[in-house]
Amino acid sequence: WNEFSFNPANVPSVLPDPMAENAQGRYAIGLNLDGEGGPDSWENPHTGETGIDNQMWRVLGCWDAYYVNKPVNPYNEGIAWDTAVDAMPAWLISVTGEDLDNDGEVNVTFDRAINIPLRDAYGSIMSGATFAVDPNPRSHSEFKGRIENNILTIEPGDFYIQGESQFYPHLQFTRTKLRFEMKEDGSMEGHIGGYQPWRDYYHYLSVRGETDGMIDLIGVFYDMKRFADAEPDPVTGENTAISAAYFVEAVPAFHVDENGALLSDSIGIGPKLSGPAVSQYSSAEQ
């Protein structure tokens, strides 16, 4: 370009908008972040909830790499997971309440661990392992929540947690919501989402490059910018965040402080009967 060699992914705005195809239709996974509906919202095919906000899916849903269903993971996310899981400290969730076996109000806390996850014989995350909570407050988020019919939800708020790899330097949302199913074995699964700075995800994709990522980075850049639906810049008025949702699987684990004192108990044996079977409950109220 103008006799200079450069990586287009680093300066995508110098190239024209290719007007890539975008996902359309009735259904998409995600959460109703704003409590409203509208022409750009979806219906969750699993829960029946309407008003789903997931413009990230509108941008990515037509690319072959993302046109998959679980248990298959999108190629980019699969590579990132296999790279990070054995090198990046674990992300921790703690649920505290009067009686977690019944409906009621709870507190939900997210933290980053000091140590990395352990794998079980299936290659999944081992249940019943012990993690020391990183005392750095930047990866600590607290929410008021509720359990109803074994479904955990939270009141909206800000979420931030640090990663530690070239792919996931951090994950952050405003107006965060989640919907997790709490299972009898102590595990949880569901979705967390909110309004994510769209450039965070674009830069994550650009690290992979177009060849490995199997997407048109210039098209994704312009579509992220076009479909961003929150957090307008005070000067330009352009939205800087895009509605998104991420699938989460969590297994039971012990949380301790830097001195080894118990903070959160590991409740249940976990999925696939993997890891140490937890059959006793400590005095921790979790």
Placement of each model-derived feature along the sequence:
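Extracytosolic secretory-pathway proteins
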Residues: 1-286
